């Protein structure tokens, strides 16, 4: 890890529990954009995503229209994938519905079995990520496959994957 953004993310954010709805939404969007790309690629563009996505304001993202999609597609500082951009808007609406249903997104996540922070290394999925992914897809979220959800659970601090020897383990 030589990229200072990646080191800072590893040391101060990833695998550290944070259950604020705006943060949970931001991480869900960023993890979805990471599909097929490296984490470093997304981290390098994170601040630009924040600007382009109105600081990941859920209400604003829910109201994005074709003009905003065109604006995002022209933004050279973010990942310009039309399917992912449209999915992010769709997912914002579903995220908001889940928050309305469960009071907050963390409460929704807690409804899945074996809740709590777990320590796992060298995995890319588990039963929890499989179940959450299936449920989100039933709700019509996109780019939320089990591997993405597993990475998301790592990002928000539910799965701690620091390896032996890491000072954060």
How would you describe each model-predicted region?
Residues 1-169:
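HhH-family (HhH-GPD) DNA N-glycosylase catalytic core used in base-excision repair
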């Amino acid at each position: 890890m030589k990229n200072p953004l990646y080191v800072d993310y590893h040391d101060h954010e990833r695998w550290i529990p944070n259950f604020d709805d705006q943060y949970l939404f931001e991480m869900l969007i960023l993890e979805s954009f990471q599909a097929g790309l490296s984490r470093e690629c997304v981290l390098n563009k994170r601040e630009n995503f924040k600007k382009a996505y109105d600081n990941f304001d859920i209400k604003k993202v829910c109201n994005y229209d074709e003009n905003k999609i065109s604006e995002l597609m022209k933004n050279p500082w973010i990942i310009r994938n039309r399917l992912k951009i449209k999915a992010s808007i769709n997912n914002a609406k579903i995220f908001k519905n889940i928050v309305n249903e469960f009071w907050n997104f963390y409460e929704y996540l807690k409804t899945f079995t074996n809740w709590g922070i777990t320590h796992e290394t060298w995995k890319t999925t588990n039963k929890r990520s499989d179940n959450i992914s299936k449920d989100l897809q039933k709700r019509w979220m996109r780019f939320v496959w089990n591997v993405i959800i597993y990475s998301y659970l790592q990002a928000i601090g539910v799965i701690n994957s620091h390896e032996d020897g890491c000072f954060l383990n």
